[in-house]
From Swiss-Prot:
Belongs to the universal ribosomal protein uS8 family. This is Small ribosomal subunit protein uS8. Part of the 30S ribosomal subunit. Contacts proteins S5 and S12. GO terms for molecular function: rRNA binding; structural constituent of ribosome. One of its GO terms (cellular component) is ribosome. Keywords: Ribonucleoprotein, Ribosomal protein, RNA-binding, rRNA-binding.
Amino acid sequence: MYTDPIADYLTRVRNAAKANHKVVEIPASNMKKEITKILFDQGYILSYKFEDNAVQGSIKIALKYDKVTKESVIRDIQRISKPGLRKYSGSSTIPRILNGLGIAIVSTSKGLMTGKLAKQLNVGGEVICYVY
């Protein structure tokens, strides 16, 4: 049993991308579904599919690769706020990742969103991860 399911999710995606897997299957939760939707909307993954089992369900993610270099679009994905050390950021202090080339995923009172959208809505929250 793992103590940080979000870190497990990010690690599975990172490892699958580094190993050039086309699809990765991950146990589902509402937060993982929202992170997956954000990654899809921002163009980091090709597609996703939620499968409901009797107990928990799973998420199948099709990873996206560059057509020329055959490298993963996800260069790195880092967990920032951890269960033992939460990292919060106000709307004015949400970081820009790689000068705007990456995204920060932030958990706000209005739900999970990118750091850019959180700045536009003027809300802060817990910085879940960086993707670039």
